[in-house]
Amino acid sequence: MDIVVKIGFWKRAVAIFIDFILLKSAVNISLFPLKRNLDFGQLRLFDALTGVNSQQAKELTFYLILYCLVGLILSLIYFTYFHGSTGQTPGKSFLRMKVIQVSGDPINYKIAFIRWLGYFVSEIAMCLGFFWVAFDKNKQGWHDKIAGTYVVKKGRTL
């Protein structure tokens, strides 16, 4: 039985930053053709909100809603697939960490999905659920507690 090295807040924050860059890039690339065809011109947010050009405001609103929906869907796929298949996202892999069940077993797609849903609970109170990792004795965020997971140094098991 190896010693488990649970990963704390800052390393996890760097991993999620890497994942965020990858996800944001995927969303931007997937919506680039649409963005190119919309006529934002030199649109400023103030103009959109005040109705100076209502067509541009409608296009901007449509684009922002679509951007959020695509981001949500890609986030679901990204985190559920990577965590469910290998226990690690590219960000976690880069920093040599992975997600496991509290029993030490690898997580599956169901647990990965529950963990992803737990992200929303962690975000509800101004992201307190994520910062919880820094103060919890087991270094678990709320999403980890909901899914019954730990983030550990890769290669280490319970």
PLM regions: where:
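Hydrophobic, aromatic-rich membrane-embedded alpha-helical segments
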Residues: 117-135
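Hydrophobic alpha-helical transmembrane segments and immediately flanking/interface helices
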Residues: 131-157
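Short, small/hydrophobic-residue-rich motifs at membrane-helix boundaries and re-entrant hairpins
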Residues: 1-123, 153-158
